[in-house]
């Protein structure tokens, strides 16, 4: 646990809550002090869902500290069981309440005896893992719980080729759009989708997971532990190549064919779908990215430098797309997923000049300032860094703000995803003629405070000290302060605006 201005991956309980709120009819209870219960607001704002977030805080206050938590936790579990009638309740502490070292597992066991629904305790070490690792672990725990609970399983796989998509969850970066694109891809390949978990799935679904012929893991961050467990227990093959970019799309489809060919029955399907012809047709005619990478517009990027940073899946994929498919130099690429550093290094070692594995945003900012790239591809934090350094940034990974939870269709996976990524890359650079004109006219005059006005009156002149003072005011109120100050100066017949005039205008407005 650490105090930080910015965290790329949140605390462990956020990962558990993301998995719980992705399933249908599952309720999460967090044992937490006030301040740790921000997940409800965050999810409601970003996902813009009609329904309330199914998460409740069992508040740790002075009464709990004095008497102990057992009664309150058990009462909250039973209350939610009665009010919501969920299939499952997941209890999780937060990193703060974990300090109390209470035996919450014992509370869960007690509540399970009385409640009508299933109750489990999120088996996560809140001191050792972050949001991503906790989400991966919680999903595996839920799947394992229900498979163990089903003493007799129908392990007969489907006759037709079928797949489970594991790892699509709430607050994921473009996850819902990616899921739609994966559905389209699998339909084209004549592969039936058996289950999609956790997003939109029921906790009763895991018992049907072994019926599929293989598992598809679109993102390494969540779902890999579940796939490895299913592979160990039921011998289910899995494909973990992310279908992002034309080259990895082709590799993913070939791995899907290989997984299906392990069993004899899918031969019937492979006769109907020619995978190589499908890859060729989609790459040449559906995805415009392959054509665009050979166009004069993309050739304008030759010699441009970029910095890439994000989660392991997106950072590695975008790095390979930039370097391998678009011919853009990646000066530095990195990830905050330190637990997956070995895989990340293996993936991008031939595609970048420099590599960084860190969760310190200041370190990333220093590298960007040193490299001075033409564009950045990163998280919301790199977008802030880019604004400070006046470097354009395309957001390619979580954590992201609300503008990257778009209502429109913007997948990153699949062949439509290649088009979206090509657009993002192209729009993140200053265009060729724009670059030329900026050079001729010495760039945009954005550093200066705008002093133009629609009024026909002569505007008061701002001296250097007052301009500097105005520049310190936050942007969202700066224009209003400027207008009010100039109105005050005109009313007083002043031709110049000084710092003293600014203060006087503020006092007059407050009076």
From Swiss-Prot:
**Which pathway is this protein assigned to?**
Porphyrin-containing compound metabolism; chlorophyll biosynthesis (light-independent)
Q: What does this protein do?
A: Component of the dark-operative protochlorophyllide reductase (DPOR) that uses Mg-ATP and reduced ferredoxin to reduce ring D of protochlorophyllide (Pchlide) to form chlorophyllide a (Chlide). This reaction is light-independent. The NB-protein (ChlN-ChlB) is the catalytic component of the complex.
Query: What InterPro entries does the annotation carry?
Result: ChlB/BchB/BchZ (IPR050152), LI-POR_suB-like_C (IPR013580), Nase/OxRdtase_comp1 (IPR000510), P-CP_red_C (IPR042298), Protochl_reductB (IPR005969), Protochlorophyllide_Rdtase (IPR016209)
Judged by the first EC level, this protein's enzyme class is oxidoreductase
Residues given in the record as substrate binding sites = 432-433
Tell me where on the tree of life, at the top rank, the source sits.
Eukaryota
Going by the UniProt record, its keywords in alphabetical order are: 4Fe-4S, ATP-binding, Chlorophyll biosynthesis, Chloroplast, Iron, Iron-sulfur, Metal-binding, Nucleotide-binding, Oxidoreductase, Photosynthesis, Plastid
Gene Ontology terms describing biological process:
light-independent chlorophyll biosynthetic process; photosynthesis, dark reaction
* Originating species: Pinus strobus
A GO MF label = 4 iron, 4 sulfur cluster binding
Q: How is the cofactor bound?
A: Binds 1 [4Fe-4S] cluster per heterodimer. The cluster is bound at the heterodimer interface by residues from both subunits.
The UniProt subunit note reads as follows: Protochlorophyllide reductase is composed of three subunits; ChlL, ChlN and ChlB. Forms a heterotetramer of two ChlB and two ChlN subunits.
HAMAP family, per the entry? ChlB_BchB
EC numbers: 1.3.7.7
> So which cofactors does this thing need?
[4Fe-4S] cluster
Q: What family does this belong to?
A: Belongs to the ChlB/BchB/BchZ family.
| This protein's name | Light-independent protochlorophyllide reductase subunit B
According to UniProt, the reaction catalysed is: chlorophyllide a + oxidized 2[4Fe-4S]-[ferredoxin] + 2 ADP + 2 phosphate = protochlorophyllide a + reduced 2[4Fe-4S]-[ferredoxin] + 2 ATP + 2 H2O
Residues annotated as binding [4Fe-4S] cluster are: 36
Q: Name one GO cellular component term.
A: chloroplast
Q: Where in the cell is it found?
A: Plastid, Chloroplast
Active site: which residues? Answer: 297 (proton donor)
């Amino acid at each position: 646990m650490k105090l930080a201005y910015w965290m790329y991956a949140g605390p462990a309980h956020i990962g558990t809550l993301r998995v719980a709120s992705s399933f249908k009819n599952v309720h999460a209870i967090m044992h937490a002090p006030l301040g740790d219960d921000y997940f409800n607001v965050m999810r409601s704002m970003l996902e813009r869902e009609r329904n309330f977030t199914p998460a409740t805080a069992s508040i740790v206050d002075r009464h709990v500290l004095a008497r102990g938590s057992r009664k309150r936790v058990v009462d909250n579990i039973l209350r939610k069981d009665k009010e919501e009638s969920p299939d499952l309740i997941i209890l999780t502490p937060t990193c703060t309440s974990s300090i109390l070292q209470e035996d919450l597992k014992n509370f869960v066991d007690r509540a399970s005896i009385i409640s009508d629904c299933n109750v489990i305790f999120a088996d996560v070490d809140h001191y050792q893992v972050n949001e991503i690792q906790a989400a991966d672990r919680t999903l595996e725990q839920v799947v394992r719980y229900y498979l163990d609970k089903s003493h007799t399983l129908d392990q007969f796989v489907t006759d037709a080729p079928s797949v489970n998509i594991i790892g699509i969850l709430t607050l994921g970066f473009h996850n819902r759009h990616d899921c739609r694109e994966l559905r389209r891809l699998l339909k084209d390949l004549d592969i039936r989708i058996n289950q999609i978990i956790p997003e939109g799935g029921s906790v009763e679904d895991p018992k049907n997971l072994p019926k599929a012929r293989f598992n598809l893991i679109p993102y390494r961050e969540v779902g890999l532990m579940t796939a490895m467990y299913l592979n160990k227990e039921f011998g289910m093959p899995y494909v973990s190549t992310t279908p992002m970019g034309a080259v990895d799309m082709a590799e993913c489809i070939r791995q899907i064919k290989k997984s299906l060919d392990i069993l004899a029955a899918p031969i019937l399907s492979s006769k109907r779908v020619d995978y190589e012809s499908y890859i060729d047709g989609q790459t040449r005619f559906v995805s415009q990215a392959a054509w665009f990478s050979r166009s004069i517009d993309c050739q304008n990027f030759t010699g441009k430098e970029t910095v890439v940073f994000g989660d392991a899946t997106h950072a590695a994929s975008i790095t390979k797309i930039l370097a391998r498919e678009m011919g853009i130099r990646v000066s530095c690429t990195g990830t905050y997923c330190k637990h997956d550093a070995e895989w990340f290094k293996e993936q991008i070692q031939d595609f970048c000049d420099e590599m960084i594995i860190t969760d310190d945003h200041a370190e990333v900012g220093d590298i960007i300032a040193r490299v001075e790239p033409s564009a950045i591809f990163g998280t919301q934090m790199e977008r802030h860094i880019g604004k400070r350094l006046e470097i354009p940034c395309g957001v390619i990974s979580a954590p992201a703000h609300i503008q990257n939870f778009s209502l429109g269709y913007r997948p990153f996976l699949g062949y439509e995803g290649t088009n979206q990524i090509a657009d993002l890359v192209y729009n993140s650079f200053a265009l060729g003629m724009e670059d030329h004109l900026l050079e001729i006219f010495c760039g945009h005059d954005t550093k200066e405070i705008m002093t133009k006005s629609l009024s026909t009156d002569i505007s008061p002149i701002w001296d250097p000290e007052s301009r500097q003072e105005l520049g310190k005011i936050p942007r969202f109120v700066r224009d209003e302060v400027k207008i009010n100050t100039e109105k005050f100066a005109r009313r007083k017949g002043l031709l110049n605006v000084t710092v003293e005039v600014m203060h006087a205008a503020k006092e007059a407005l407050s009076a």
